[in-house]
Amino acid sequence: PGWHTECCVMIDSIFREQNGYIDIHGGGFDLKFPHHENEMAQAEAHNGNRLAHYWLHNGFINIDNEKMSKSLGNVILAKDVIARYGGMPFRLMVLNTHYRAPLSFTEETIGEAMKTYQKITSCFKSLSIKLQRQGIDLPQIKGSDEEEFFDELCNDLNTPNALSVLFSEIKAANQNMRQKEIDWEALKGNYGRIRDYLFALGVDGGEVKLDQEAMELFREYEDAKKAKDFEKSDVLRGKLVEKGVF
């Protein structure tokens, strides 16, 4: 019982003003019993409440289809994964699996997540550039009220389904950008929703803010392409790459 008491005491000492009551308590699904049941019992005896409003029990991480554990010697540190693959692809890989399900970490799954992140940033960068070049102010993050996306998050934090809503919006945005006559209001709507979804998921979409120099470089770059001056367009493209636009 000492282990369970330690957790209750720590929570009570930090959240005493809330009567030792927290909104979300997380942990691996193997802690559901007896640890979390004992925490609840002790907290209820002490404060008269069940300690937490929501309990989230996550699945284990499997490395190449084996449970990650010290005994198997296959432990991978998060800092090493982020250093090698990047934080955003790793986040997307995690979000693409429901938190209660086992998470399979393989070169294939992280590789797919890297490709997915590239698709997201490619679309989001293109959207932000097109809108700015049209003289349209980029909408600020406001907390989306798009029902379908947040319904999925409210449904036991169903991040895989929430990602599906995001990808549907990205598909619509790419289709709108390919139109000969672009509906700029529709495109602005695509941008705003994608930006809200990414913000809610904690994903950096790689938004580009164009300064006056970048706007002028873009104009010269497109003029050079139209004139089929490929040598000049390559030089200008290189400058845009240096500014993080391409």
Tell me the role of every PLM-derived stretch.
Residues 67-69, 74-246:
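Structural preference for alpha-helix termini/caps and helix-kink/transition segments
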Residues 1-127:
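Alpha-helical recognition segments enriched in aromatics with Gly/Pro capping
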